């Protein structure tokens, strides 16, 4: 019996959207929800930007956005695209010619802001460049940069103004027979963002890129993004996400995956389940978890690890994880493997031992997945 049948209260039914591509990455439809970030280097610092793109890709980024504010950045973009392991989205504001240059430089997608890209004639030129160079586009509406006529009409940024901006530019793209586009309606206010995205989801079948813009620093921005994006994703809205933080782009990727993991929408790496610790703990839970999270960052295989300080909840949690450790007494605890009690291990040796067991379990899971893929391939009829 499937997990969905056993636990119907965990089901999330994703909104049906058209599928487009950003380079080789599918967005929308039944594709996995893509996780992306944006570089914060000067684009003209080619080595620094490439290094940041690579770090983001290593952390799991499917797509990376790069700002293109001037001609020198357009020139730099060509080499960045060539060296990037993931598709590059060119972030375009004010100067429509930067969009044309970015398309010609090989960007996989052009993000334009309806609030500052200019009139329809300029947008048409960007559309032509995108079509000629096999680029997709994102209409990126921001509450902080709405068109003047919409602010005059609605008096302030509101969901209606943001959606109207998006729909106006959708019409321009569709009138020019361009359909490889996604939409975003971002604001720094969680309520405003959520309302705009919900209305937009009802108004179009275009894939939606989710984000709470200018969310804040690592802690506050993570909380705000988790609430805003998490609620939308729970409702089935969203095809790609970017967590905007005043922090290292790698942190944005980590938070993005953690949000998706929490909702069961996408899994990557080790999901650590740990207690907050109390006087009952049989070892230092907090320091142990910090050490394990750092040492297990290289694991890409989706799996779970429970680190629980005592026997109140430890054995029960361990039964539901791939690897588990529950604190006991006399300086040792119990190791659980594949949900079963296995053996005791001293607290002193526990961290090294758990890392070893996680790596071993990851290899086992990878082998199982490879075998299943081979069986599926063997069952497919020859063309």
From Swiss-Prot:
It catalyses: (2E)-4-hydroxy-3-methylbut-2-enyl diphosphate + oxidized [flavodoxin] + H2O + 2 H(+) = 2-C-methyl-D-erythritol 2,4-cyclic diphosphate + reduced [flavodoxin]. The keyword Metal-binding applies. The keyword Oxidoreductase applies. Pathway: Isoprenoid biosynthesis; isopentenyl diphosphate biosynthesis via DXP pathway; isopentenyl diphosphate from 1-deoxy-D-xylulose 5-phosphate: step 5/6. Coiled coil: none annotated. Its EC number is 1.17.7.3. Binds 1 [4Fe-4S] cluster. One of its GO terms (molecular function) is 4-hydroxy-3-methylbut-2-enyl-diphosphate synthase activity (flavodoxin). [4Fe-4S] cluster binds at residues 275, 278, 310, 317. It holds the Pfam family GcpE. One of its GO terms (biological process) is terpenoid biosynthetic process. Keywords: 4Fe-4S, Iron, Iron-sulfur, Isoprene biosynthesis, Metal-binding, Oxidoreductase. Its cofactor is [4Fe-4S] cluster. HAMAP family: IspG. Converts 2C-methyl-D-erythritol 2,4-cyclodiphosphate (ME-2,4cPP) into 1-hydroxy-2-methyl-2-(E)-butenyl 4-diphosphate. NCBIfam families: ispG_gcpE (TIGR00612), PRK00366.1 (NF001540). Belongs to the IspG family. This is 4-hydroxy-3-methylbut-2-en-1-yl diphosphate synthase (flavodoxin).
């Amino acid at each position: 019996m499937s997990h969905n049948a056993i636990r119907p209260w965990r089901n999330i039914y994703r909104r049906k959207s058209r599928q487009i591509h950003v380079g080789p990455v599918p967005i929308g439809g039944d594709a996995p929800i893509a996780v992306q970030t944006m570089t914060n280097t000067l684009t003209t610092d080619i080595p620094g930007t490439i290094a940041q793109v690579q770090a983001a890709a290593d952390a799991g980024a499917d797509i990376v956005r790069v700002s293109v504010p001037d001609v020198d950045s357009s020139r730099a973009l060509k080499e960045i695209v060539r060296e990037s392991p993931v598709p590059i989205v060119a972030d375009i504001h004010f100067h429509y010619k930067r969009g044309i240059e970015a398309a010609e430089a090989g960007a996989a997608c052009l993000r334009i802001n309806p609030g500052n890209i200019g009139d329809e004639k300029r947008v048409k030129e960007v559309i032509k460049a995108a079509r000629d160079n096999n680029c997709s586009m994102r209409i990126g509406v921001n509450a902080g940069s709405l068109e003047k006529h919409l602010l005059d009409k609605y008096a302030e940024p509101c969901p209606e103004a943001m959606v109207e901006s998006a729909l106006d530019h959708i019409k321009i793209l569709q009138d020019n027979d361009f359909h490889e586009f996604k939409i975003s309606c971002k604001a720094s206010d969680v309520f405003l963002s959520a309302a705009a995205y919900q209305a937009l989801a009802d108004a179009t079948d275009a894939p939606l890129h989710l984000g709470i813009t200018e969310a804040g620093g690592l802690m506050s921005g993570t909380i705000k993004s988790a609430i805003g994006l998490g609620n939308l994703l729970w409702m089935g809205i969203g095809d790609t996400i970017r967590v905007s933080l005043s922090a290292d782009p790698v942190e944005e990727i980590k938070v993005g995956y953690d949000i998706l993991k929490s909702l069961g929408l996408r899994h990557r790496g080790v999901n650590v389940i740990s207690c907050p610790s109390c006087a009952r703990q049989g070892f230092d839970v907090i320091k142990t978890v910090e050490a394990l999270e750092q040492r297990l960052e290289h694991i890409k295989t989706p799996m779970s690890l429970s680190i629980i300080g005592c026997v109140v909840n430890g054995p029960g949690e361990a039964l539901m994880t791939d690897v588990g450790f529950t604190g006991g007494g006399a300086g040792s605890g119990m190791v659980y493997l594949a949900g079963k009690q296995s053996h005791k291990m001293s607290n002193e040796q526990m961290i090294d031992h758990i890392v070893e067991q996680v790596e071993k379990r990851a290899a086992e899971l990878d082998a199982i997945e490879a075998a299943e893929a081979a069986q599926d391939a063997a069952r497919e009829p020859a063309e």
